[in-house]
Amino acid sequence: MAAEIILINPPPLNWREKHDALNHPHLGLAYLSAYLRQNNFECQPIDAKFERMNLEELGKAIKKYRPILVGITAMTHEIGQAAQVARLVKELFPEVKTVLGGAHATALPQETLRQFPEFDMAIVGEGEITLLELVKTLIQRGELSKIAGLAFRPSSDAIILNNCRQPIQNLDSLPFPAWNLFPPSQTYSLITTRGCPFRCKFCMRVSGNQPRKRSYQNVLEEFKMDINKYGAGQILVEDESFGLDRKQAYPFLDALADSGLNKKVKWVTQTRVDLVDEEFFQKLKAAGCAWVGFGVESGNEKILKEIGKGITLKKVEESISLAKKTGLQTGSYFIIGHPYETKQTAWDTINFAAKLNTTTVAFGIMVPYPGTEIYSMALRGEGGYRIISSDWADFNKTIGASLELETLSRKELEKLQLLAYFVFYFKNWRFWDFFKLLL
């Protein structure tokens, strides 16, 4: 089969990750595939995680094609799986080039190429234009050194990082995600903006600090496509902070309500507590939004200030109360293991989360993701941190074990995480919700 480029989301690492894997195809691969096809290159994405493939099954899928380039995306904890995929590609097609993209490659491009010789190149930041230029350069046998946003290995003992690539400004110029190249799904994701202006110490910002927005008309057309062409039953609006620009969000929400699409699909999103008010929630509700999530992170004011979150507990309570009043389901996200965290501050978080009693909740253990200020602090031993693993697979907030604090051992952090769920559900008499969590 003809496919000049194959783009891969690696298989799940283990049964737990297979169970927890997302129930919708990868948005980044869909954007990249659409962009390459718009520019007349045959591209085939393989979302091994979404399809719950193992490595052997992925190998059979890859062998159907004759690529000149294989791209692999990976978060930090997935980098080992991505390297396994790259090794598999080299076994099947020794002459084919492999390129890594995603958060880990963006944060540590040179270090990653040094650690994993299976990758020939790494893309730093947004991938559409860089990947297209890479494909053209490989076909024309041009110079890789001229491609902004690329790291590559010109020889076995050298690694070059080219100049940075500026973020795409006109997001409306990008084609809609190529969902037709993936197996059918009931759920699809989209974004209305790229980039985040906030500077939380724990967060990776692959798309940079400069917010760039799509026109509301462009987003509305994608909504229509997902529903009418692909039969979406649920849409995830995956902006880091939906509603960052009211001048964009309000016309979109009004148009969505007027279009009747709000009655055809359930959609969810996430935002910040300091970006919302009652009018905002009313427009969300009228536009068909069913659930809105908030990154609360901590139930302690000093910790919130330490991590640069820029919110207060009072504002958290006010915003979530307003969302509930409007009839929206709510979600809250918390982290245990902030800089200088103690057992008392962790319990402040647990009790505050229970008090909020959102529809859903998630408690993660802090991970020092490369590219974040937390990572730099942990490397320097600041914040009371100790990195206790050099295995990137442990850099997973749900099931990993990458760091501990002088005041809280890894076992204590894990115990607090479990207790957080127990207290949240049992204190609110939500016993069945707790047991569903264990299934």
Where does each model-flagged region fall?
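Proline-aspartate-enriched helix->loop->beta-strand connector
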Residues: R66-V70, A232, T358
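Glycine- and acidic-residue-enriched helix-capping/strand-helix junction motifs
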Residues: R16-L29
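N-terminal [4Fe-4S]-dependent radical SAM core
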Residues: I5-I6, P11-K18, L144-I147, A151-T192
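Glycine-rich beta-alpha loop elements in corrinoid/cobalamin-binding modules
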Residues: E4, Y35-C164, I168, I365-V367, ...
